[in-house]
């Protein structure tokens, strides 16, 4: 994606036709999402600013571009929140973010491709959306600093499962996904700095 973005930038530098503008816009949107998955806030902000400048020079603004810009702004805000929590947030939020990072790394090592992180639909969210070959995998991450009092899975109650089901349905409709999909849960017991956190991957978990 980085190479595609650079190629679109070079084209746009010498060509301001609708085709070049469209190529620049959509590769920038995809690049911003890629940087968000990698937690690269500074670089994502630069792409977002470039998109804002591009939008300011458009002769006509399409509804799809406007919607994409709103989603990019939401992605940036979530990145800022994650960074703020990681820097000075309360312990339970720091542990939760650490668990999500661990889960992303765990999935990548298993060959999964991370598509989205912290995807939101209204007040419902999906922690990780990944591809396992051609199968879309929606992942909920549950992290506890200790299992002495409560298992991580205990937080996945009936209401949470219902919200996840709605969010997954919304995402599949929005992205027009017709291929296979499943819902996984990754449970983690440990805290930042742990030498050997306990990680369990529950595949095809019933909602």
Report residues per predicted region.
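Conserved catalytic cores of phosphodiester-cleaving nucleases, focusing on short active-site segments
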Residues: 103, 107, 126-149, 164
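Alpha-helical junction/boundary sensor with strong preference for TPR arrays
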Residues: 8, 12-15, 55-62
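Domain-level recognition of nuclease-like catalytic cores that cleave nucleotide substrates
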Residues: 173-207
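Acidic-basic catalytic patches of nuclease active cores, encompassing PD-(D/E)XK
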Residues: 79-117
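Mg2+/Mn2+-dependent nuclease catalytic core
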Residues: 145-174
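Residue-level signature for tetratricopeptide repeat
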Residues: 27-30, 34, 75
């Amino acid at each position: 994606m980085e190479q595609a973005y650079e190629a679109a930038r070079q084209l746009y530098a010498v060509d301001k036709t609708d085709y070049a503008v469209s190529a620049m816009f959509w590769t920038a949107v995809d690049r911003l999402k890629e940087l968000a998955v990698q937690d690269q806030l500074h670089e994502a902000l630069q792409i977002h600013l470039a998109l804002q400048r591009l939008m300011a020079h458009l002769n006509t603004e399409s509804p799809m571009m406007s919607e994409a810009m709103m989603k990019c702004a939401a992605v940036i805000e979530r990145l800022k929140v994650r960074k703020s929590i990681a820097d000075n947030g309360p312990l339970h939020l720091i542990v939760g973010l650490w668990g999500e990072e661990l889960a992303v790394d765990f999935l990548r090592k298993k060959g999964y491709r991370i598509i989205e992180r912290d995807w939101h639909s209204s007040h419902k969210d999906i922690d990780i959306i990944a591809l396992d070959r051609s199968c879309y995998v929606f992942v909920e991450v549950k992290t506890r600093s200790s299992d002495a009092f409560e298992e991580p899975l205990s937080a996945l109650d009936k209401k949470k499962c219902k919200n996840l089901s709605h969010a997954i349905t919304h995402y599949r409709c929005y992205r027009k996904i017709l291929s296979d999909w499943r819902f996984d849960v990754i449970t983690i017991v440990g805290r930042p700095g742990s030498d050997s956190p306990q990680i369990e991957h529950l595949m095809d978990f019933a909602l």
